[in-house]
Amino acid sequence: MSNNLLQRGKAIKLAVFDVDGVLTDGRLYFLEDGSEFKTFNTLDGQGIKMLMNAGVQTAIISGRKTPVVERRAKNLGIPHLFQGREDKLVVLDGLLEQLGLSYEQVAYLGDDLPDLPVIRRVGLGMAVANAADFVREHAHGVTRARGGEGAAREFCELILRAQGRLDAANAAYL
C-alpha cells in the first residue's frame, strides 16, 4: 500500500460506493418473472460496518435502481442511498453540501466510466481490480481484489489503516 494512498485516506470522513461491479461482481441476473437479483460479499459488508463504527459516514450512488440494493443498504445501515443516477458528481455535490464536507474528505470506489468524474474529483478515488482499464489508469489506486470479492473490504481497511483505526476496529472482535 503506497504512502500516497495512506496520506489521502487520513482526511476521509465519507466513503462512497458504486454497486454493480463494486459491491457485486457486476453480473445482472434476471428471473422469468422480471425480477432481478445480485450477490453481495459478506466481507465487504463487514468492512463497511467497521468503517461506520469508526465514525466514517457512508453512501451508495448507483446508476441502476433495484429493490435489492435498497435492502442491502438498509441491512448494512448505510444512511445515504442514491439509485438510478448516472450524474454521480451532481449527486455527490448535493450530499457534500448537506453534510458540510469537502471533496478532499471523500473516498470513492468505482469500476466504470460513470464513476470516473467522481474518482478524479475526490480526495481518495479508487477502482476495483477488474475495473475498466481507463478507470484504473485515472484512479489514485486500484484494489487487489475484484468487485464483489472483497474490494470494498480492502478499501475500507485502507481508510481505517490510514487513520490509525484498523487495529482498534479488529480488536473489537477479540
Predicted regions and their residues:
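Short coil/turn segments at beta-strand junctions that form active-site/ligand-binding loops
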Residues: A11-K13, V56, E104-Q105
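Short, basic/glycine-rich phosphate-binding loops at helix/coil junctions
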Residues: T24-F30, V69-L76
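Asp-based phosphoryl-transfer active-site loop
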Residues: G9-L28, I119, A152
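Mg2+-dependent phosphoryl-transfer enzymes with acidic/Ser/Thr/Gly-rich catalytic loops
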Residues: F37-K38, K74-L76, H80-F82, L89-L174
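Substrate-recognition element of Asp-dependent hydrolases with the DxDx(T/V) motif
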Residues: I48-R72, F82-Q83
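Non-catalytic pre-domain segments flanking phosphatase-related domains
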Residues: M1-F17, R165-L174
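Basic, amphipathic juxtamembrane/active-site segments
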Residues: L6, K13, R27-K49, A129
